[in-house]
Amino acid sequence: EFLVKNFEDTYGVLSAKNGAEALAILEQQACDLIISDALMPEMDGFDLLMKVRNDEMLCHIPFILLSVVDSVASKIKGLEYGADVYIEKPFSLGYVKATVESLLENRKRAFHHFASRPGFQYEKDDMGRNDRQWLDKLTGIVRENLTCETLSVDLLTEKMALSRSSLQRKLKGLTGVSPNEYIQLVRLKTAAQLLRSGEYRISEVCYQTGFSSMSWFAKCFTKQFGMRPKDFIRQNQDGKSSG
């Protein structure tokens, strides 16, 4: 209750009395971060943490574990189970707030870094291995169907064997964007790779990545990468010649 009162003015907060109740909420609601007490009835914080980290749809969520146990063994256990941060009680409210802000901001910064670059590689610490594999699979499906009229959120849900709401919840939590926005991002990042190769004209890249209008392609590309397609080509040609 103390944390709920101190966070609800800044964030949307969902509370649970124990780990089992929290897990039920997590399976139905999109959550950006979890703060859990280690000691709870029915299912304690460690068990909740383990279930979250072993669930493909939840494992991306940052997890803060609070505990009255001030021992190295307990801290190691929390980190081994996958906690992002282990905080001992009594804690400083300011420290908890700063930790929450930092974890959420780091997630935003990581995806912005990924989205603003042409390639599909992630920085090593941007996300966990399971999340990278999940996103790689989704990205592969989009790239295989870029020129297909059937490319849609429905196609992704079918190929990923997920409900529409589950796909939305996982992707939004992992990247901050909706499935439709991610499809557009993959189109543009693929376009940037093709343009950088120097093997295709802008018009060819436009249609190879599923855009039906050159002007719309140029507008979307400029918004995503901060330069027009022709300037992007020129910059990469200059880089190759100077290298």
Tell me the role of every PLM-derived stretch.
Residues 91-100, 112:
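C-terminal output helix
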Residues 173-212, 234-243:
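Terminal helix-turn-helix DNA-binding modules in bacterial transcription factors
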Residues 1-14, 169, 174:
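Two-component/phosphorelay signaling modules centered on CheY-like receiver
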Residues 15-33, 197:
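Acidic, metal-coordinating helix/loop segments flanking the phosphotransfer/catalytic sites
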Residues 40:
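Receiver (REC) domain active-site loop signature in two-component systems and cognate sites
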